[in-house]
Amino acid sequence: MKKFTKIIALALAIVLTFALAACSNNGGDDAKNEVIKIAVPNDTTNEARALLLLQEAGIIKLKDGAGITATKNDIVENPYNVEIVEAEAAAIPSLLPDVSYAVINSNYAINAGLNPVKDSLFKEGSSSAYANILAVKSGNENSDAVKALKAALESKKVADFINEKYAGSVVSTVDNPTDGFDSSVDYAALKGTTISVAASPTPHAEILEIAKQILAEKDITLDIQTYNDYVVPNTVVEDGTCTANYFQHTPYLDDFNAQQNTHIVSVASIHVEPMGLYGGTQKTLDAVSGK
């Protein structure tokens, strides 16, 4: 009887050992095959920009010819089995705990307390195609108010502020900064007037505060209206509520005009915000680098 009991105990131990080994192996396979989720902006131009960044990082490959209008349907190679999660650009930083990685615009990264230079795992170069612009309604490009605002934003004072404040996470695109004033503008006629501009809080509204100081020297008030979305800043320019806006790049504006039948044009390129790939549940790029 004792011998029989020992045999049963030994058999149970062997079965348990194999069961634990099987569970361990399955867990390893599950971890190895876990889908990597990457959040990207859901608007047309920023999603394409994010996908191009992921391609540059070697994470995916897009079909030939896919450019600034690329979508996730243009992915032809996906060696790491990544799942693209589309979300509102402004909301992406809040998704970091729930995704493996996220591609975030620098302004939203900064607003969320992230440092695009130190915290991003991979970031794009300073592509002029995505420079942030000062935009106005077509027909107003040559008004003194617009030229005065443009001159203030193209000043050395603004360029120096950008370089010192953001240390590479925002880069000035003004080639020849000026004293902030345009000799063709009748500043005396603008004295006592208000120029309204719609902007994103960070860094646009912060940069505009420097332009505001310059305009104040001519007794011109700059009314900075901040918005957290990508739609209202254009609609308030189209309907005349605001003189100008400062929050977007040209590819986004072109797409917006085409989709909304608006008539907004760029009058100046001010800065570029390199888009970055940030870690969520994954803190390194090992999961998408074959390591």
Language model: regions and residue ranges:
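C-terminal motif of bacterial Sec signal peptides marking the signal peptidase cleavage site
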Residues: 18-22
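Short, well-ordered beta-strand elements
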Residues: 34-39, 190-202, 220-226, 291
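Periplasmic-binding protein-like
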Residues: 50-51, 55, 145, 153-174
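Short helix-initiation/N-cap motifs at beta->coil->alpha
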Residues: 66-94, 224-235
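Ligand-binding "clamshell"
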Residues: 98, 111-123, 255-267, 282
